[in-house]
Amino acid sequence: MKAEIITVGDELLTGNTVDSNSAFIASKLTEKGYLVRRITTVGDDVEEIKSIILEALDRKPDVLVISGGLGPTHDDVTMLAVSKALNRELELCEECLERIRKFYVELHKKGLIDDPELNEARKKMAYLPKGATPLQNTEGAAPGAFIEHEGIKIFVLPGMPREMKAMLLNEVLPRLGERTFIQKKYLAEITDESKLAPILSEAIRKFNVRIHSSPKGFGKYIGIIIFGEDEEIIEKVIEFMQSRGISFKEGW
């Protein structure tokens, strides 16, 4: 099962904002058993976002998660780009509009904004691509969207980390179903990654697991993560590597 992630925002490309969203999304998709094959960042330009989406769809991932660009300002154009990429008109979601209205009324009651009225900028957030299922935003105004397109599950989420995380956990992950997936982290006592490489390759072929290695500077340990669906198989991988002379301790 493969997945791709697209994060949207000029601020990500200028370095003014660190893209923590893609790391969080990738970690949760990995826990669900998805292999994240690509993470792409694009600026707030309709045609560029559309192009990146079309490129991702051509690779036929099982899941595509897009984050950012759903707010009320002029440069929040992600939903428009999605509609263009999928050739679906934007339609007003009345349910979303009512939630947005209530959101601003509550902010006004708390004294956080001066005007609770639904101006055109706020109404813009209630438009979703035709056929999309709205995803509830419990932490903000802009709804997300879930679209099934040619067998690909597409999720469009806000860029604010608090809003994105809540929507991912509450709306996205439940739609991906339940799948047992395990990742175990170890430190392999070996100083040369090149000597470890053939052993890892043999283990991957033999046990049908995914293994990621990461050198820890020039110390005597190399970090290893083993991904699989069966804990017994992962233990057999460790036993196999130990039989090849590699010592382990748990950690990372």
Curated annotation (Swiss-Prot):
SMART domains: MoCF_biosynth. Pfam families: MoCF_biosynth (PF00994). InterPro entries: CinA (IPR050101), CinA_Arc (IPR023055), MoaB/Mog-like_dom_sf (IPR036425), MoaB/Mog_dom (IPR001453). It comes from the Archaea. Belongs to the CinA family. This is Protein PYRAB15930. The lineage of its organism: Archaea, Methanobacteriati, Methanobacteriota, Thermococci, Thermococcales.
